[in-house]
Amino acid sequence: MAKNLIVCCDGTWNTPEQREGGLPCPTNVVKLHNLSVEDESQRRYYHPGVGTNGGVFDKALGGGVGVGISQNIKSAYEWLCRNYATGDRIFLFGFSRGAFTARSLGGFVARCGLLDLSSLTDAEAWSHVADVYDKGYRPPKPPTKWPKDYSFIPGPLVGGKVDIHMIGVWDTVGALGVPDDLVLLDQLFDDARKYRFHDTRLSPVVRHARHAVAMDEVRASFAPTLWDEGTKRPADGSFKQQWFAGVHSDVGGGYAETGLSDGALKWMVDEAIAVGLKVNPALLAQVQPNPRGVLHDSASGVWELLRTLPRATPPLLPSLAGSVLSAQVIERHTVPPLSQAPYWPTRTLSVGDEVTLDVFARPHWNPTGIYLEAGATYGFSASGEWLDADIACGPDGPKKGVFQLGRI
């Protein structure tokens, strides 16, 4: 009898035990794992995020540099090899760098298949997994033949390939190296070439794919890794990549206030149930989405000092609800919360139209809510003056005149 195999990969520094102000605040990965039924027809696996093991230095490297992602991928792969039988349905879920882990794991399985470890000792099994990872997944061209003691479980696809029933991820973050904001650490530790092999493209062997993306995240080092919507899909497959209200952890979970993240969780669970995931309905009933829930500020604390970059998001048009925008986004836009209104005022500027906006110096970014028509030509002009203490600045920068120490 075919069974479901559920792999859940958590985000950076995320664990089931994490708390905020003494209150439990697990991510959506933990919640999905908890509400998934475990019985003979469905097995589940959870892995905490990078940066959760070892001492302070190890945790900093794991969270900031991405050290540990490769090991997390191999651990989840080994579990799949131990539990998979031909015809089983593989579900991969993840958040943040855990989403990157899940997508990379999907690329690993798509390229190499699953090893048969049933006749090997633990030491032999881990050696085989590491070997297939290093020689079969990382290089651009994997070997065409493996040694005789390397056996692979046949999958149901042409050529014996293993298919992946579903990949569901919240706000994939693909920055494995040190964030660019941390220049010194970047020079010491970051080697982008080391991580180029990670395959996060959506393989044709993935039948169903779902990606929930955060509309309001502005941290530059948390840039999303989107799927290419033009990727070829199986005839019976499906693909949805939707934007949700909130910052990174408002979508993937991790705050004590869960109105927004519960919306992204409920969407993902409903999509997974539709393709065969088994859940406990009493636990699912505890998920309470609120489109007007608290929208947090992730660019605060130490992040306030680092580089920010708003995401390129689609316009908030009701016609896009349910396709590229979640219904939650449009509902919050239409009737915003009283304490955080308005939400993404939107205007598409037609050719020939004019609009004047106030731009303030204090915020890093001034959201305009203006969208332009693709392929059209527009003209822009700026005027006015900003004051930084007693230093006058115009659109071209500090105004010429007497040298002032504050310019340094």
Q: What is each PLM-predicted segment?
A:
Residues 1-373, 379:
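Active-site- or binding-pocket-proximal scaffold segments within functional domains
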Residues 354-373, 377-408:
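N-terminus-centered regions that define maturation/targeting leaders and the start
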